[in-house]
Curated annotation (Swiss-Prot):
It is found in: Cytoplasm. SUPFAM superfamilies: Urocanase (SSF111326). This is Urocanate hydratase. One of its GO terms (biological process) is L-histidine catabolic process to glutamate and formamide. The active site is at C404. Catalyzes the conversion of urocanate to 4-imidazolone-5-propionate. It comes from Thermosipho melanesiensis (strain DSM 12029 / CIP 104789 / BI429). InterPro entries: Urocanase, Urocanase-like, Urocanase_C, Urocanase_central_sf, Urocanase_CS, Urocanase_N, Urocanase_Rossmann-like, Urocanase_sf. Its EC number is 4.2.1.49. It catalyses: 4-imidazolone-5-propanoate = trans-urocanate + H2O. GO terms for molecular function: urocanate hydratase activity. Pathway: Amino-acid degradation; L-histidine degradation into L-glutamate; N-formimidoyl-L-glutamate from L-histidine: step 2/3. NCBIfam families: hutU, PRK05414.1. GO terms for cellular component: cytoplasm.
């Protein structure tokens, strides 16, 4: 049974308090048709990343939240509400564990056996932790990545440069706008027409075509004129990329955001229509995967050839290199990952995808907080540019929300300012403050966030576990711990938190601790690995690290 879900707006409560109303509204917001990729099947984004295991579980979660007291905690096991325990008002109202498996059994094949038996759910990162805010949630990170590429190779701008990528799903859909915000041109290959239509509708993609020659003509004209342009091409990357190599057409930058982390549901083989692929996936998944692997090999071999001919290439965290490597492309890892290449220094400062959403549903609440963040950090010209661009270019999906990459000290200062705005009646209703799991200290993912760590600690998973426990101890409203987000089952462990700014003194105390400690652990994680930026940041903010100077 499916239905249309939208979070309530305004100040009338369905639950007993804002600390339980907030997770209920954000769960519902994850399944808003404006937000979710496939809401009828509870799929939010990222292949099969779900908000709840099934509709019965969804209904029970909502019912339980409506009756939950301020000293009780709901436990959610892979999208299923399993228990309520008496705790205390400082404890989280919800604790979530999604997709976690003992390491020896942590592979897609076994996961799918358990999923078919109704025992587990794939939560991705923010799908099962109820803090997905639509494509904007990844937009600034994508913008920052392409800005870093421009700064490193192209004198700080992508003007007159073009990017080749593939995948316009809920994550990859941020790429076209992120490139054009950096004044560049992008050709984005996508096999699913619905995804192209969605990006056009939300303003992330300028134009589309199903003809390669027409697409290239538009791209080349924009390059000559130095005008930003995003072009969607309805086609398969495993066909398009080798064809470009054959023609000697080499982009300036090449990356990829197909959902290759889940090859069965996230990647479509070449040489067949999208509908035929869906039928084959259902009728003969083994044959389907064989064709996927062959296509991925062609796809990555073409990118490697473009790299040899001068293109700046990087993997955008979907684990496609590993998939290609496992099927014969032994130089797949000559393609660098985007985190060590472009994001690690930001993580070392404690910067990452901090986000907030207006529970009122009133966009004015977000515009007022936009103004506040610029007042608090007037020295940050890059932040100012981002907020101004977001206000002009980003369309709301579901509850109005904003993302800004803020660092150690900044997150707590801003969170407390928001809480005061709620207290003083400047905002219509409370604000939820959270982040992506893809953050400075909350992930162990050797092919993405923790790839090529300075001390070789890529696969150490103690840090996200410490992050989750620290957020519980600090007073977050809900805390989650997941497996397999971004890069797929077997390749990552990660934690998330959300805290509600409801204007109370208790919220003030919780926000101060959570927003200091959560990001502080990220600084510690990078300082412990030997990154000078992180060491200096830890000292600047007086973070106690007993062995820092030993």
């Amino acid at each position: 049974m499916s239905r249309t879900v939208k979070a309530p707006r305004g100040t009338q409560l369905s639950c007993k308090n804002w600390q339980t109303e907030a997770p209920m509204r954000m769960l519902m917001n994850n399944l808003d048709p404006e937000v979710a990729r496939d809401p009828a099947n509870l799929i939010v984004y990222g292949g099969t990343g779900r908000a709840a295991r099934n509709w019965e579980c969804f209904d029970k979660i909502v019912e339980t939240l409506k009756n939950l007291e301020m000293d009780e905690t709901l436990l959610v096991q892979s999208g299923k509400p399993v228990a309520v325990f008496k705790t205390n008002e400082w404890a989280p109202r919800v604790l979530i564990a999604n997709s976690n498996l003992v390491p020896k059994w942590a592979n897609w094949e076994y996961f799918r056996e358990l999923e078919a038996r109704g025992l587990i759910m794939y939560g991705q990162m923010t799908a099962g932790s109820w803090i997905y805010i639509g494509t904007q949630g990844i937009l600034q990170g994508t913008y920052e990545t392409f800005y870093a590429v421009a700064k490193k190779y192209f004198n700080g701008t992508l003007k007159g440069k073009w990017v080749l990528t593939a995948g316009l799903g809920e994550m990859g859909g941020a790429q076209p706008l992120a490139v054009t915000l950096n004044d560049g041109i992008v050709l984005a290959v996508e096999i699913d027409k619905k995804m192209i239509d969605r990006r056009i509708k939300t303003g992330y993609l300028d134009v589309w075509t199903n003809n390669l020659d027409e697409a290239l003509e538009m791209v080349q004209n924009a390059v000559k004129e130095g005008k930003p342009l995003s072009v969607g091409l309805l086609a398969n990357a495993a066909d398009v990329h080798p064809e470009l190599v054959k023609r000697g057409i080499i982009p300036d930058i090449v990356t990829d955001q197909t959902a290759a982390h889940d090859p069965l549901t996230g990647y479509v083989p070449r040489g067949m229509s999208f509908d035929d692929a869906l039928n084959l996936r259902k009728e003969n998944p083994k044959k389907y995967l064989e064709l996927v692997y062959e296509s991925v090999v062609r796809h990555i071999e073409a990118i490697l050839e473009m790299q040899k001919q001068g293109a700046k290439v990087f993997e955008y965290g979907n684990n496609i290199r590993r998939l290609a490597y496992d099927h014969g492309v032994k130089d797949a890892f000559n393609i660098p990952g985007y985190v060590p290449e472009y994001i690690r220094d930001l993580f070392s400062e404690g910067k990452g995808p901090f986000r907030w959403a207006a529970l009122s549903g009133n966009p004015e609440d977000i515009y007022k907080t936009d103004k506040k963040v610029l007042e608090l950090f007037p020295y940050d010209e890059h932040l100012k540019k981002w907020v101004e661009l977001a206000q002009k270019k980003v369309k709301w999906q579901g509850l109005p929300a904003r993302i800004c990459w803020l660092g150690q000290g900044e997150r707590a200062e801003f969170g407390l300012a928001i809480n005061k705005m709620v207290k003083d009646g400047e905002l219509e209703a409370p604000i939820v403050i959270g982040r992506d799991h893809h953050d400075t200290g909350s992930v162990a993912s050797p092919y993405r966030e923790t790839e090529a760590m300075k001390d070789g600690s890529d696969a150490i998973a103690d840090w996200p576990i410490l992050n989750a426990m620290l957020n519980v101890a600090s007073g977050a409203t809900w805390v989650s711990f997941h497996h397999g987000g971004g890069v797929g089952i077997g390749y990552s462990l990660h934690a998330g938190m959300v805290t509600v700014a409801d204007g109370t003194e208790l919220a003030h105390k919780k926000l101060e601790r959570v927003l200091t400690n959560d990001v502080g652990l990220g600084v510690v994680r990078h300082a412990d690995a030997g990154y000078e930026i992180a060491i200096n940041t830890a000292k600047k903010h007086n973070i106690q690290m007993p062995m820092l100077d030993t």
